[in-house]
Amino acid sequence: MLSLRVPTPTSFDFRRYQAGDLERRWRLSRDSFLSFSPKFEENRGFRFGVKSSKSDVSFTAAEEEETLPEELHAELMPKHVAIIMDGNGRWAKNRGLQPWDGHRAGVEALKEIVELCGKWGIQVLTVFAFSTDNWIRPRIEIDFLFSLFERSLKTEFQNLAKNNVRISIIGDSSKLPKSLLRVINEVEEVTKNNTRLQLIVAVGYSGKYDVLQACRGIARRVKDGEIEVEEIDERLIEEELETNCTEFPYPDLLIRTSGELRVSNFLLWQLAYTELFFAQELWPDFGRSGFIEALMSFQQRQRRFGGRKS
């Protein structure tokens, strides 16, 4: 999927072009960025293997659970994993590729993680796709990010639905393209009763936004006389947060790729007792081995939730 934090690559510097140039370039590239460039095909062996069929694999969450790797213990698996998918832009820049090649490679990485979550019994996977802070990016970049997201939903959601995956989108939808909103509504409706894995994609989201919209919702309920001010507590706030779409709203484990050591305004309320794991790999390079390493680290920790074990 898309990257949370993508530096503008020097191989395609948006600031160098005038508005007309950007529009022409977008019209020429809007279809091509949704496919791998020839140079990407040459370079993808670094991640997928030149002759590997991995880049053509669809999102799945296999019907049967795969035996866990011997390093992991089923009783210690997290119920909810959240991921900040960072590094698509740098991955592309390092290989002399176009920015959309990095984002498309990021989609391939997400496919693998979704499949592993389904096989290994993880019940919720939340990924940070587009932050409210990302709206300051050049319009052309935002447009192709949303086009990639829309195309991915259209082409993959039937595979996910077939494999009993529920898809939920959280975040401020007021600025999203109408065509994307239609796809989101359809995908959520078709998959709403699926139970094997819930994939939550945060788009136009930030932790601050989530708390703010929750407070506004509570304020409206007070104004309408539904509740008294004295009734406001943590439980009520949690009911208004956008993660109320899942039975397990609090991530057990947060993974951030690319070596950055921060949570970047993601799920600020929900991460209160979450275990954090920072991976050095850029997101397109993050796969099975990195995921196992993160899960092993999680399983070795003692979670006290503010208490003390005797």
Swiss-Prot record:
GO terms for molecular function: prenyltransferase activity. One of its GO terms (biological process) is plastid membrane organization. GO terms for cellular component: chloroplast; chloroplast stroma. Its cofactor is Mg(2+). Gene3D superfamilies: Decaprenyl diphosphate synthase-like. Keywords: Transferase. Catalyzes cis-prenyl chain elongation to produce the polyprenyl backbone of dolichol, a glycosyl carrier-lipid required for the biosynthesis of several classes of glycoprotein. This is Dehydrodolichyl diphosphate synthase 2. It comes from Arabidopsis thaliana.
